[in-house]
Design a protein with these regions (language model features):
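Non-ligating segments of multi-cofactor redox enzymes
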Residues: 1-199
Length: 199
């Protein structure tokens, strides 16, 4: 079965923010929450690189391991999802994530963070019934419609790729061979190291 992955090629990203805008608009993401964001490394310096960051849906996701109520889980195709009805807002997932993907929209005077929100790889939530309630919690389920995440579809330079991990890695190998060097695949080894090593 396909193992869904993201890849951001820093050599191609032009920091246009199409991916972040597409995500916010597609899923009606609340103010203050960014399921996907752009980061520029070495901003204003020669050789600066921009990367699009979100949940990378890691092979061995540390957020799953630290969640005390098991609200974070991985689907059979490798997408890391969460159940907002189970989330207690402890924030352990935020501290465990190397990409800073889990976010908490509300904070109170007593330290409660509210329910965690993060990229769902456009796969909706645990019910996947397409209901209005499901949409309000998790956004649109494009995967059930046979589509890829909108952030990757909207990337005009194809810096952000999403889909079957074998296909994505083949595309990146071809780009690397054409360029003569790699290193533009930000987050790939951090998120998918265990599966790449074992194959």
């Amino acid at each position: 079965m396909a193992r869904m992955k993201f890849l951001c090629d820093a050599e191609r990203c032009i920091e246009c923010n199409a991916c972040t805008t597409a995500c916010k608009n597609e899923h009606d993401v609340p103010w203050g929450i960014n399921r996907r964001r752009l980061v520029t490394i070495g901003d204003g310096e020669p050789g600066e690189k921009s990367i699009s960051i979100s949940c990378m849906h890691c092979t061995d996701a540390p957020c799953i391991a630290v969640c005390p109520v098991n609200c974070i889980y991985q689907t059979e195709i490798g997408i890391v999802l969460h159940d907002k009805d189970l989330c207690i807002g402890c924030g352990y997932c935020f501290y465990a994530c190397p990409f800073g993907a889990p976010q908490f929209p509300t904070a109170t005077n007593f330290g409660s963070r509210g329910k965690m929100d993060k990229c769902t790889y456009c796969a909706g939530g645990p019910d996947a019934d397409g209901s209005e309630a499901e949409y309000r919690k998790y956004g649109r389920n494009r995967i059930a419609e046979g589509k890829l995440p909108l952030c990757a579809e909207m990337c005009s330079t194809r810096a952000l790729l999403a889909g079957d991990g074998e296909v994505i890695s083949q595309i990146y190998r071809e780009r690397t061979a054409r360029r003569g060097y790699g290193s533009g695949a930000w987050g790939w080894t951090t998120a998918y190291y265990m599966s790449e090593r074992s194959s």
